Amino acid sequence: MAVNLSRNGPALQEAYVRVVTEKSPTDWALFTYEGNSNDIRVAGTGEGGLEELVEELNSGKVMYAFCRVKDPNSGLPKFVLINWTGEGVNDVRKGACANHVSTMANFLKGAHVTINARAEEDVEPECIMEKVAKASGANYSFHKESSCFQDVGPQAPVGSVYQKTNAVSEIKRVGKDNFWAKAEKEEENRRLEEKRRAEEEKQRLEEERRERELQEAARREQRYQEQHRSAGPPSPSSRTGELEQEVVSRSRQEWESAGQQAPHPREIFKQKERAMSTTSVSSSQPGKLRSPFLQKQFTQPEASYGREPTSPVSRPAAGVCEELAPSTPPSAQTDDEPTYEVPSEQETLYEEPPPVQQPGAGSGHIDNYMQSQDLSGQGLCARALYDYQAADDTEISFDPENLITGIEVIDEGWWRGYGPDGHFGMFPANYVELIE
């Protein structure tokens, strides 16, 4: 609630005017509240200065004091406003009266120093006069200054500012300047030398790193050569690579002769998976079974047995490449008629192939190599040189030194086979090497 100055307005104004009047003997006035209301009344006035005013302050009330003092520096009158909040006042009253400070300051205008006091130590006359002296901003006595002119007599002639040069001190100063210039130059040279040495050290470390890499590459190459020499002559692997290239090129030629563009290996694999998933077992004759597995093994052209034991037959019309299956030894093919026959869409039954003609010296090695693969029962196998992570579910993952079995050469850059986890999928051909 706002403070009320109108109820006792004439008495308040009269006390204030008596203090601000310079010729009036009254030099202080004290104001307080009427009971617990917000009405301001005059608590007292006096002529005894700050010492008398301090004695009238009550520690259980909120009071406002306005006092006239003399500036100790200039001797001019100064006015001091004291906002007194006693230590015995409750917190609720303190909060309510805190909003009245600005209103009382507007009413008691002209104060040079405002002091917010809570204890007697805050209103000691010495402390108040010290604050008044600091607030004046001038260290002179207005009444002590004399306005009369005083003749102090003739002034002495002004001396010259010339100073004789001291050679010794000049030499020392110049020498000192040269010393610091030399020190700065040496410091700059030292930084350049450190930078040059750091560059040389960096180049030396780079050269050592290159040499270590070359030596490690040479040792890896040497170990690779030793492994190949210990495994046997490299001719079968080279001939196997030639056979793989021939298989891939023949597959592409068959696609081109059929007027179609060779599909990507990934598309071939997906089409083959779809074809195998949609193939169902059809009705068969009594005493015979139909097997897609025997279809893939026994429908090879007869000419392929004598020429390329590992050559897969590409079927452009079906849209997929047949698996690369090792040829069966002639002794195993002289049994009775098999109890399996191919599905109805391919009615060609397995028949005993004609006797294999005697191949040349080069093809003999290939036959021996493929027969060794047949005996292993794993098909075409390879060892991983690097690690590879599958990009999707149509590929397989493997680590270095893992074995990949049942490999089918479906493209020059992509093969497919069974990974170490048994999953069948594609993988890059340059990540593996065939096992001789």
Swiss-Prot record:
Record PTM N6-acetyllysine, positions in chain: 176, 296
Cellular component aspect of the GO annotation: anchoring junction; cell cortex; clathrin-coated vesicle membrane; cortical actin cytoskeleton; cytoplasm; cytosol; dendrite; early endosome
InterPro entries, alphabetized: ADF-H, ADF-H/Gelsolin-like_dom_sf, Drebrin-like_SH3, SH3-like_dom_sf, SH3_domain
Keyword DNA damage appears in the UniProt entry: no
Coiled-coil annotated residue ranges, if any: 178-232
UniProt subunit comment: Interacts with FGD1, MAP4K1 and PRAM1. Interacts with ANKRD54. Interacts with WASL and WIPF1. Interacts with SHANK2 and SHANK3. Interacts with both COBL and PACSIN1. Interacts with DNM1 and SYN1.
Protein name from the UniProt record: Drebrin-like protein
Provenance organism: Rattus norvegicus (Rat)
Recorded name of the encoding gene: Dbnl
